[in-house]
Amino acid sequence: MDSAIKTQFDRCEAEGLCRSDVAGLRMKWIPGQKHLIAQYHPTWQLVKRKASFQKPTMTQPFNPDGFNFTKVKESEVLARVYVKDRKVVFVRDSSDPLPEGVDTLYTILLNVSPICNNHQLLVPNLEKCYNQVWRYDLTENWIVFCENSERDDYVLFFNSLCGFSSVNHLHLQVMYSSSFYATATGSPTLPLPDDFTPSKLPLEYADCRVLFKREFVVCLEVKDWLSQAIKLSIEHDANETAEMGDRKRRELAHCFNELIRACYEQAFPYDVVFCQHGSDIYTFIRRYQQPLEDLHVNPACVELTGVVVYRSEESFDRADQDILMEECKKVVYFEPSIWDDFVRSYVNRIVNN
């Protein structure tokens, strides 16, 4: 799956379709025990896409007059696929009918301002123009995308409205964590975790505490990170049957969907990360989007994983873990009592049903 799409990504780069080139990215380690990465590209200050809204609500309707993916050129399409029988299947002709039982065609688009190699967008049923609101019926399919990747560093990202989504047209982003480490200058602060690997994001080394365990799913709270967050995790056995894998995927999707429903009920913006072949899902539950003005950082999904995109060279050069943490706790975090009530309510929601 990944290699076929990478071929098309390379074609787009060669044709000059990207506003910024991956080779021009500057990356470096940020000193500190969290092993954060800072990233900067000079062109990001020069080219900006107009926002399709100023102050969105979490369920803002789709706006056909704002930027949306129906306006993307065919040359920026990397592939079209659907999900069937636990597999991601490529479509040769978009006019061909989908197989019986399949109702979602995913268009894979070039991200024209890539922050890693093969940075892509996944848009379900592009022409139906869903707004950027989670569709619970697609959760298991997103997990299948992760399961089908050839690579251990495949990561799916989602920013909700009010959580720094810049386009109100339903989409997820695909990135590869090893790309963030490949050209980072300097050295990570020692000691590195024993299980350190480029196939993990900085977030994945954060301390967690267990909130509950179900038959297959473990729910954990991420501690002392850039955002308050919940981690849902399953473990796969190499010898498990396909039916057992389906049961685990369903339970994981159920626990995740209930978490997202709780976010919408409380009007709490959120950002999501699917990683480790879909076995782990992190959800950042955060306050309404607000930039870290002094640092020139928008704390969206990628930034909250520990890959911090700076919008000014000066801020990039001065990147500091402690200052970043302090600012995130002011801008992104809920008050402890609000957060504790939310977590308690979610745990009761799952455990008692």
Model-found features: residue ranges?
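A short glycine-rich, hydrophobically flanked beta-strand micro-motif that places a catalytic Asp/Glu
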Residues: 152-166, 170, 267-277
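A general "terminal functional-core" signal
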Residues: 242-244
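Active-site microenvironments that recognize anionic phosphate/pyrophosphate groups
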Residues: 1-142, 177-240, 249-353
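Secondary-structure boundary elements
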Residues: 143-155, 163-166, 178-183
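Short beta-strand elements
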Residues: 172-174
